[in-house]
A protein has these predicted regions:
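Short, structured coil segments at secondary-structure junctions
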Residues: 3-4, 23-24, 208-209
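Structural motif
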Residues: 9, 38, 71, 165-167, ...
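ALDH superfamily catalytic-core signature
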Residues: 17-151
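Active-site phosphate-binding strand-loop segment of PLP-dependent enzymes
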Residues: 1-11
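Conserved C-terminal structural/oligomerization subdomain of aldehyde/semialdehyde dehydrogenase
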Residues: 136-221
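Short gly/Ser/Thr-rich phosphate-binding loop of adenylate-forming enzymes
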Residues: 14
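Generic beta-sheet signal
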Residues: 11, 30, 73, 215-216
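Short glycine-enriched loop/turn motifs at secondary-structure junctions
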Residues: 2, 31-32, 63-66, 114, ...
Length: 221
């Protein structure tokens, strides 16, 4: 409210943004995000895996630009997962994923509803989450808990803000790109793609229309 402050730059969640908007000053504020990353069959898979783990695990995924869900073309999905495991991701089994979801998601997201994570797990280490939510011991330096799910799963639609990364398979890159638009909820915040196909790179950039769009790199670069 200081008289010499004419503009507020705010991030940190809807509560903080709402408070800033009530100050009767100009406001630049960051909105919600659920950044998808698409990986197609032309991508450099080892590099894509390294970049995704690096980006999605940055500050335990609490940063809103971090990769939140992986949408991968079926033909390279297994290779991508194997490469991600080389960089500190630990894949969970289906039963573990469902137990984890019930614990770390307070309000399951879906099409048209962004949902909400359980704040008790936001920003926690992957090893802590595995231990507390599943009673599972994983290496303390685990960077991500990798969860292969179907495309309608709440983990795809909910911004977790923790090192829990859902992955879903798609028949084609175009199908994955179209789904990326949906699960990002139209926030137009952040999205990324790993591909050597220029037409796909351009198409995703246009249809996502995000403030931040990354091609063949991690979102924090």
């Amino acid at each position: 409210d200081h008289a010499m402050v004419s503009i507020l730059v705010v991030t940190g969640g809807p509560g903080v943004v709402r408070a800033a908007m009530q100050r009767h000053k100009k406001v630049i504020a960051a909105g919600p995000g659920n950044p998808p990353v698409v990986v197609d069959e032309t991508a450099d898979i080892p590099k894509a895996a390294k970049d995704i783990v690096a980006g999605a695990s940055l500050d335990n995924n609490i940063i809103c630009i971090d990769e939140k869900e992986v949408l991968v073309v079926e033909s390279v999905a297994d290779q991508l997962k194997a490469e991600m495991e080389k960089h500190g991701a630990v894949e969970l089994a289906s039963e573990q994923i469902e137990r984890l979801t019930k614990t770390v998601i307070a309000d399951p997201g879906r099409r048209g509803h962004e949902g909400m994570a359980n704040k008790a797990f936001v920003g926690k280490d992957a090893a802590y989450i595995a231990r507390e939510a599943l009673g599972l011991a994983v290496p303390e330096d685990t960077r991500l808990l990798l969860c292969e799910v179907d495309r309608g799963h709440p983990l795809i639609w909910t911004e977790q803000l923790m090192p829990v990364l859902p992955l879903a398979r798609f028949s084609t890159a175009d199908e994955a790109i179209d789904y990326a638009v949906e699960c990002e909820h139209g926030f137009r915040h952040t999205a990324s793609i790993h591909s050597k196909n220029v037409e796909r790179l351009s198409r995703m950039a246009k249809v996502m229309n995000c403030s931040l769009f990354v091609k063949n790199g991690s979102n924090y670069n």
